[in-house]
């Protein structure tokens, strides 16, 4: 006879916890803010370096690309950071894997791409993921 009140109490508690969790799940996906930020801001700077490294890893080009102009950086805050990055990248004189003293290629070897990246970022754990990438050549 005593088991029935405890079972009813456990069921009531489970329902209550479920009802409390639902608004949290809905709220978790809400944007807290979207702002344009400076490229020199720590986490934006880390994200820019990370996309440069990723772009070069995925590229079949023999020369390294480097960001030469940051056109726009937006930071979106939810339960993580998301950066929307518009950049101008150019081929450098450095062939892979060399990365020091790299300057832009000139004349016939000049190659430039304009790219937009959306990056999922949890920089305090050094976790990044490209959500969207779109690049076009000059």
Swiss-Prot record:
Family from the record: Belongs to the cystatin family.
Keywords for this protein: Antibiotic, Antimicrobial, Disulfide bond, Glycoprotein, Protease inhibitor, Secreted, Signal, Thiol protease inhibitor
Summary of the tissues where the protein is detected: Detected in the epithelium and lumen of the epididymis, and in sperm (at protein level).
GO molecular function: cysteine-type endopeptidase inhibitor activity
Family annotation (InterPro entries): CST11, Cystatin_dom, Cystatin_sf
Segment forming the signal sequence: 1-26
Listed Pfam families: Cystatin
Function text: Has antibacterial activity against the Gram-negative bacteria E.coli. May play a role in sperm maturation and fertilization.
Disulfide bonds: 94-102, 115-135
Gene: CST11
Protein name: Cystatin-11
Glycosylation, residue list: 132
Subcellular localization(s) per the UniProt record: Secreted
Recorded GO CC terms: cytoplasm; extracellular region; nucleus; sperm flagellum; sperm head
Main location: secreted
GO BP terms in the entry: androgen receptor signaling pathway; defense response to Gram-negative bacterium; killing of cells of another organism
């Amino acid at each position: 006879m005593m088991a029935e009140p405890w079972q009813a109490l456990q069921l009531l508690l489970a329902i209550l916890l479920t009802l409390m969790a639902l608004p949290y799940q809905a709220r978790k996906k809400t944007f807290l803010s979207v702002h344009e930020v400076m490229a020199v801001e720590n986490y934006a700077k880390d994200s820019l370096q990370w996309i440069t490294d990723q772009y070069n890893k995925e590229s079949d080009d023999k020369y390294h690309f480097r960001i030469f102009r940051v056109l726009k950086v937006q930071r979106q805050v939810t339960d993580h950071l998301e950066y929307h990055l518009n950049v101008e990248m150019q081929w450098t004189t450095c062939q892979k894997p060399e990365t020091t003293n790299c300057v832009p290629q000139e004349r016939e070897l000049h190659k430039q791409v304009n790219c937009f990246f959306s990056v999922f970022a949890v920089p305090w754990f050094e976790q990044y993921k490209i959500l969207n990438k779109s690049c076009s050549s000059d």
